[in-house]
A protein has these predicted regions:
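Short alpha-helical patches at coil-to-helix transitions and adjacent helical residues
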Residues: 56, 85-90, 112-115
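Contiguous, well-ordered alpha-helical segments that form the cores/surfaces of helical PPI scaffolds
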Residues: 60-64, 86-98
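Post-Walker A helix-loop "phosphate-sensing" segment adjacent to the P-loop in P-loop NTPases
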Residues: 95-104, 127-131
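Walker A/P-loop
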Residues: 70-92
């Protein structure tokens, strides 16, 4: 049943108010569930300004396959400025840790500074309100360094 199609006009005002709150909660839960299980939905939820292209859908499908275990290895080759680093080095680790809080991820980049930068971005995302609406994963208080952090789970 679609909650938005239910006629609530004849209900008492306090019940209408509760029903409207339930609609909002239901919509938020649907967004949360989709973002937990679909990488591109996660991206769109935490990055509202994101502009989606066909190549994003393709790589997101591969990331979903990687997360589900359908594939175990993935090499990503894309031209510069096509969101490869944002997806693979920042958003994917945050999404994967949300799905599997005990997961260990090694970030390999051509400089240590770049790996720390991506680690810092992922850490800030995991500490954000937007992320908390999707995943219950939190970081340990004593391990919040940009280059090395652990979840509390």
């Amino acid at each position: 049943m679609n909650l938005n199609q239910v006629d609530i006009s004849k209900l008492p005002s306090d019940v209408r108010k509760q029903f409207k709150q339930l609609r909002v909660m239901h919509a938020e839960k649907k967004i949360q569930n989709k973002a937990q299980h679909d990488f591109l939905s996660f991206v769109k939820t935490v990055w509202p300004e994101f502009i989606e292209g066909a190549h994003h859908r393709h790589i997101a499908k591969k990331f979903n396959d990687l997360a589900s275990g359908k594939i175990t290895r993935l090499i990503v080759n894309m031209p510069p400025r096509h969101t490869k680093s944002e997806f693979a080095s920042f958003l994917l680790p945050a999404w994967m840790v949300g799905r599997q809080p005990k997961l260990k991820i090694i970030q390999a980049t051509h400089t240590g500074e770049l790996a720390i930068r991506f680690g810092r971005k992922a850490k800030h995302l995991i500490d954000s309100e937007e992320y908390a609406k999707i995943f219950k994963t939190t970081l340990q208080e004593d391990s919040k360094a940009a280059g090395r952090w652990e979840t509390s789970q």
